[in-house]
């Protein structure tokens, strides 16, 4: 009788909390994917996280390693590792694509695009088959082009396909701002728009602030320019130091974005999204500030950019468009609806 009473009270408590089991799939159990799964679990973003990889045993091993920290860290999320069996990712609320290969010596941009597009195509076909209602978060590089390809391949509405890059770039921008100001990094605001790449991103220094005070009134112009340059080569700086691409901040960025979706937090986050006239850009996927909630992209925010900033965005869009056009030339969009 006592057990039955406790059970019923538990059900009532869960109902009062509007409890809803959530499932997130992370494709790619490399450094970025595994870190994302780990942070998602620690922050209890979802009830279940599925980590999937093509390499035999890799995802299982990473998932087991994460789960063996559960009692130490204190999380209840279940992390499962899977080798290439997408049926176990079925009914995911959010799917994250981190899989892809880095550019190798002697590899052309077109070759890298072709290789990663094939990987993304295979992944997307499996994910959409088993989780047709999911929101897609793309991290694979070149990120803007892979997000654009994912949107075209799935045929999903644009609010359900999101590229993660701008969030990571903005986090790096705020780091360099806080270092220059000598202040708490949580008190700094900064945003990066444009393409995800050291030549295409646009750290918006004019909008940067410390506790609401414009950074332009706190730092000399040359120092701000130094911060902008450091931000733009932030990824390359880490690659040089680490000998490989960064993974901790990218993994945490994924968790931050997914949490805003799953928990309907309506956070303002710069992401790569498909534009249909916003900022004077059409039929292109590029980074702009958006509100992220349960439906994915809830709203695209129109910033009051000046002439110089708009020109930089157009220049960035041109570079991003070249990648997207290359995918068309390579025949990748011929797969759509086939």
Stretch-by-stretch model annotation:
Residues 154-160, 168-338:
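C-terminal substrate-binding/catalytic lobe of Rossmann-fold NAD(P)-dependent dehydrogenases
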Residues 54-92, 325-332:
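Conserved N-terminal Rossmann-fold NAD(P) cofactor-binding segment
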Residues 108-174:
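Rossmann-like NAD(P)(H) cofactor-binding subdomain of soluble oxidoreductases
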Residues 71-134:
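Rossmann-like NAD(P)-binding element
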Residues 33-34:
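N-terminal Rossmann-fold NAD(P) dinucleotide-binding loop
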Residues 29-30:
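Glycine-rich Rossmann-fold phosphate-binding loop(s) that bind the pyrophosphate
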């Amino acid at each position: 009788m006592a057990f039955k009473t406790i059970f019923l009270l538990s059900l009532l408590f869960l109902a009062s909390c509007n409890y809803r089991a959530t499932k997130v799939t992370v494709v790619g159990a490399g450094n970025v994917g595994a870190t994302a799964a780990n942070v998602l679990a620690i922050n209890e973003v979802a009830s279940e996280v599925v980590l999937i990889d093509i390499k035999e045993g890799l995802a299982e091993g990473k998932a087991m390693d994460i789960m063996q920290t559960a009692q130490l860290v204190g999380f209840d999320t279940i992390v499962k590792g899977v080798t290439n069996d997408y049926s176990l990712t079925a009914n995911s609320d959010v799917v994250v694509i981190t899989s892809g290969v880095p550019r190798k010596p002697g590899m052309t941009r077109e070759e890298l695009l072709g290789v990663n597009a094939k990987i993304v195509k295979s992944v997307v076909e499996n994910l959409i088959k088993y989780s047709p209602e999911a929101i897609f978060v793309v991290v694979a590089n070149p990120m803007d082009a892979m997000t654009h390809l994912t949107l075209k391949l799935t045929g999903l509405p644009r609010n359900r396909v999101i590229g993660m890059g701008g969030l990571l770039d903005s986090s790096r921008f705020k780091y360099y701002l806080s270092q220059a100001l000598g202040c708490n990094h949580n008190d700094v605001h900064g945003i990066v728009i444009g393409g995800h790449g050291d030549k295409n991103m646009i750290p918006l220094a004019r909008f940067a602030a410390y506790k609401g005070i414009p950074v332009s009134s706190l730092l000399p112009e040359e120092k701000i320019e130094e911060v902008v340059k450091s931000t733009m080569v932030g990824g390359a700086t880490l690659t040089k130091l680490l000998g490989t691409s960064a993974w901790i901040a990218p993994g945490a960025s994924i968790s931050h974005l997914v949490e805003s979706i799953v928990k309907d937090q309506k956070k303002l986050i710069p992401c790569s999204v498909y534009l249909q006239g916003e900022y004077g850009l059409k039929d292109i996927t590029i980074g702009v500030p958006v509100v992220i909630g349960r439906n994915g992209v809830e709203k695209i925010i129109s910033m009051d950019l000046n002439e110089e900033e708009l020109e930089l965005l157009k220049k960035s869009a041109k570079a991003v468009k070249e990648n997207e056009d290359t995918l068309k030339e390579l025949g990748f969009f011929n797969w759509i609806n086939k």
